[in-house]
A protein has these predicted regions:
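Formylglycine-dependent sulfatase
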Residues: 2-8, 13, 20-432
Length: 434
């Protein structure tokens, strides 16, 4: 830690990051969606999606327009976020499911997560929504996504929650119109279903948390992890679908050679899902706005860091890919918006290539805990970019795709501002360079 600190001070001697510890500790509201592409913000003008609340958040803070996910798959991305370490080191080399469970794929209980550090420093902590960092084990939880060849959903016991003392969450579950949850004290077999769209219910719970579960004289950190716009695109309230019923989908395909032709499998996959994908985003946006408005109403926003991001994007048919576990822009690029009225200059775009996992050291630094970042953290501390406007366009971010059954297999890559270089290996032997 001393080496990390000295390098930071030499590089940015006038940056106010280290003045924060003597002031009031900021609150943190960390909101993430699942599978939200980086270009899909109305304020960017690149995709015809309506996101007025996030556009306002971008105006009130920093919009990282070149943000990426280094391993664009749910569990590995979340594992890197929570630990600040890359997959080979944090052991989350693939999605947490029964197929990968024999290889130890889950968030280690002894990992030092950023939430552990905040809890140790007196923060009240809450987690709402999708977690997806525990390996399913027999007898499997009785949910629809545990009845096939691979089980996906799992409860997280208190000792594995890494400092979060309020809990309304689930492992992974994609039926968005009737989601399921475990509450803080619920045992493994006592989950419940809600007849309400997931993001709406999770915003309700966030508002309830802000009003009834915290001492407002003490700092708090709340994560709200919304599953849409993850697949199950059609599982969104009709009022959001109505907003896109007249969208000219063919116009979106113009001058896009990466989108296959109409009548092909992947071309039709894109055309059949893009309206509902945008509808999910608009619904998530509206519910994020509800949370932010409640922070304002309670007088908490001024000293609250609000983050919006996503674990990864999605190809949705582009490049002949339905999914996200690939190095293309649609998969790797994500939104990262950060506001803090007391400290962060509004209406600021940054081109520094921040990664999803860089939020661990970056947020701890701007919150005043830079000296407590563990030595094993591997990701970039970009607090200077947030607080001082020190762009760093020389950052090179890694790219991963790993077969958990054989970690020497899969893709490895490097991404610069202009290029992505990847290699594919089978049993440790390189067989493809891209």
């Amino acid at each position: 830690m001393k080496k990390r600190l000295n390098i930071f001070l030499l590089a940015f001697p006038l940056c106010p990051v280290f003045q924060i510890q003597a002031q009031e500790k900021p609150n943190l509201v960390f909101i993430m969606a699942d599978q939200w592409r980086g270009d899909a913000l109305g304020c960017l003008g690149k995709e015809p999606v309506k996101t007025p609340c996030l556009d306002q958040l971008a105006r009130e803070g920093v919009n990282f327009t070149n943000a990426v996910s280094s391993y664009p798959v749910s569990s590995p991305a979340r594992g890197m976020l929570m630990t600040g370490m890359y997959p080979h080191k944090n052991k989350v080399t693939g999605n947490c499911n029964s197929a990968n469970a024999p290889y130890g794929v889950e968030l280690p209980q002894d990992a030092r997560c950023w939430s552990d550090i905040l809890k140790a420093n007196g923060y009240q902590t809450g987690y709402i929504g999708k977690w997806h960092l525990d390996a399913p084990h027999e007898p499997y939880i009785d949910t629809y996504n545990n009845h096939g060849a691979v089980a996906w959903n799992e409860w997280c016991p208190k000792e594995r929650r890494h400092g979060f003392d309020y809990w309304t969450a689930y492992g992974t579950y994609d039926y968005h119109l009737k989601p399921m949850y475990w509450d803080t004290d619920a045992p493994r077999d006592s989950f419940y279903y809600v007849n309400q769209w997931g993001p709406e219910y999770e915003a309700d719970k966030a508002i309830e948390y802000l009003n009834g579960h915290i001492d407002k004289t003490q700092p708090f950190a709340l994560v709200v992890s919304m599953n849409p716009p993850h697949t199950g695109y059609e599982l969104v309230p009709d009022r959001y679908k109505e907003m896109y019923k007249n969208l000219n989908v063919e116009a979106l395909c113009t001058n896009r050679p990466d989108i296959p032709a109409k009548g092909t499998e992947m071309g039709d996959y894109f055309r059949n899902n893009i309206r509902n994908y945008y509808a999910c985003m608009t619904g998530v946006d509206e519910n994020i706005g509800r949370i932010i408005n409640e922070l304002k109403r309670l007088g908490l926003l001024k000293n609250t860091i609000v983050v919006f991001t996503s674990d990864h994007g999605i190809c949705m048919g582009a490049h002949e890919q339905a999914g996200k576990d690939i190095f293309y822009e649609e998969s790797m690029r994500i939104p990262v918006l950060i506001s803090w009225p007391e400290k962060i200059k509004p209406k600021t775009d940054r081109t520094t290539m921040i990664a999803f996992a860089d939020l661990y050291p970056t947020l701890l630094s701007i919150m005043g805990f830079q000296q407590q970042i563990p030595e094993e953290v591997q990701t970039f501390d970009l607090a200077s970019v947030l607080l001082c406007g020190k762009e760093n366009n020389r950052i090179v971010q890694p790219y991963y795709y790993i077969q958990s059954s054989n970690p020497a297999t899969g893709y490895r890559g490097l991404r610069t501002d202009t290029h992505t270089f990847t290699i594919h290996a089978t049993d440790g032997k390189v067989d493809k360079i891209i």
